[in-house]
Every structure is written in C-alpha cells, then in structure tokens.
C-alpha cells in the first residue's frame, strides 16, 4: 500500500503526465477472497497490475492452479476389548488415506513447476476424522489428476471399509493467469522496460502460489503481479527495506510514464 500511495503522491505533487489511473486495495487476499467480489466495471480500468510479489524487479504472470479438499472419515466405535472385525477407527483410516498420497508430491519435496498435495490440518478420534488439503499445480491437467487421485483413494477405502466411510469434497480456488495474460503481453513487456529503467534486471518465474491478479485476469481484467521488495512472507521473519520499497515505487512510476506515451 505504501509503495502504491507514494507513487500516487509523487504523480500529484510533481504533475507528471499520466493517463487514467485506477487504484484499489483488496482486504482479503490471504484467505483467497480478495477479488471474489471485486467490481471490475466499477473499477474502470482495462488492464492492471497487482503489487503483491517478492523481490523488487519481479514480474509474475504464471501461477498455480489451485483447489482445496476436505476429506471426512466416518468410523465405527465399539469397546476395544471386543473390537476385532468390528471397529473402524476413523483416525487410522485417515492416516491410511494420507499414506496413499505420494511422499514426493508435498510442498517440502517440490520446487519450480512441480505441484503438490499439502495437508494443512487434521484431527479426529475413533468415530470421525477430517483431513484438509490444498492442491496446487501450474498444469491444469495435472491438478485434475490430483483431484481425481483423492477420489480414487476414497473409492478404494470405501470398498475396503464400507460405502460412505470416506467422503471427499473438492472446491476450486483459482486458475493460472497465463492464458489470460498472453493476449495482452504488452503488460509484461512494459513492466520489463520499467524495471530496466530503474536499473534492475527483470526476474520472471512461475509463482508457487496465487495472487488476486489471477482471479481478476479470469474475470476479465488482465493483471500480472509485480514485486514488492519483501522477504520471508507468511512468517515471523517477514521484512523489507525502505530502499527496496523506493525501487518498487520507481517501477510503478515508470510504468505510468510508459503508458502515458
């Protein structure tokens, strides 16, 4: 916010030439709802950038396809002294479900364009257990495979323990913006020019995550993401420097200048 507002202050104070500019801040990005109710016609822009990336000089226009899955296991509790061939321990079935997923497709074992299953939460007892996953992949077909795999595991366990033992609910979250950015690649080309004018080398890597720009792009507002200059996001060591924030503001001003010509 500070980088964007500082750029706006400089434009107003110095009277720099610019076209129509639209500025907005979305409050719920970190829970995946930042752009779900965003009023694109009311916003009034044809193209946009989000400022939500990593190191200053970064341009992100390819991100994960994303889904979330909730796995619910229904057990059958009886006295453990007479449980043989009768008890279905929901917590054990939950561990069996998770154990059926590939170990090398977890966040801690993947990088680059490799997708993953991420177990975010789990809890349970003998009668009921729940697993919460997020699924990620840059390739939409590979994400679909991951979703199908969860259903196949559920089918196998239901065949083993009885129908209805395992239920899987899957909800799509966001999609890779690349398809929507390609027809408007001037956004990337002009961002490159703006970064180079600021004395930096553009860095373009697929995002191992998502941004509101992905949702906005699929809703009709092409919107790549720019670096903020921050580090160690989503942790107690998250930080940035004033110098990097100044550079991020300089890049925004350069973009405005490029589009004003």
Which residues fall in each region the model found?
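Acidic-enriched catalytic cores of C-N bond-cleaving enzymes acting on peptides and small amides
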Residues: 61, 83-121, 141-167
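Active-site-adjacent substrate-binding region
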Residues: 92-109, 116-118, 165, 175-223
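Short, hydrophobic beta-strand segments
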Residues: 73, 129-137, 170-177
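Alpha-helical metal-binding/catalytic segments enriched in His/Glu/Asp
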Residues: 1-29, 69-73, 79-80, 84-104, ...
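Acidic/histidine-rich catalytic neighborhood of metal-dependent amide-processing enzymes
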Residues: 1-64, 106, 110, 114-120, ...
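A glycine-rich, aromatic-flanked flexible loop/lid motif
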Residues: 67, 119-132, 153, 157-169, ...
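Structural motif
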Residues: 21-22, 45-49, 69-70, 203, ...
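Zn-dependent metallopeptidase/amidohydrolase metal-coordination segment
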Residues: 125-127, 202-251, 256-259
């Amino acid at each position: 916010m500070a980088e964007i507002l500082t750029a706006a202050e400089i434009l107003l104070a110095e009277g720099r030439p610019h076209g129509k500019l639209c500025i907005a801040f979305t409050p719920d990005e970190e829970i995946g709802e930042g752009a779900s109710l965003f009023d694109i016609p009311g916003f009034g822009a044809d193209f946009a950038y989000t400022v939500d990336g990593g190191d200053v000089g970064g341009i992100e226009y390819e991100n994960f396809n994303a889904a979330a899955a909730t796995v619910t296991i229904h057990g059958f509790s009886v006295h453990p002294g007479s449980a043989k061939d009768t008890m279905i321990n929901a917590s054990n079935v939950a561990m069996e479900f998770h154990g059926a997923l590939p170990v090398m497709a977890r966040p801690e074992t993947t990088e680059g364009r490799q997708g993953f299953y991420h177990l975010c939460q789990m809890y349970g007892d003998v009668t009921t257990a729940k697993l919460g996953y997020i699924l990620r992949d840059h390739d939409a077909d590979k994400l679909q495979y991951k979703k199908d795999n969860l259903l196949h595991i559920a089918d196998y366990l239901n065949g083993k323990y009885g129908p209805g033992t395992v239920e899987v609910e899957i909800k799509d979250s966001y999609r890779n913006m690349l398809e929507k950015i390609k027809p408007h690649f001037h956004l990337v080309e002009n961002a490159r020019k703006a970064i180079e004018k600021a004395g930096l080398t553009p860095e373009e890597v697929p995002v191992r995550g998502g941004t509101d720009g992905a949702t906005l792009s699929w809703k009709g507002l092409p919107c790549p993401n720019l670096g903020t200059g921050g580090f160690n996001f989503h942790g107690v060591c998250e930080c940035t420097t004033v110098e990097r924030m100044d550079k991020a503001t300089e890049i925004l001003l350069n973009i405005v200048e490029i589009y004003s010509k």
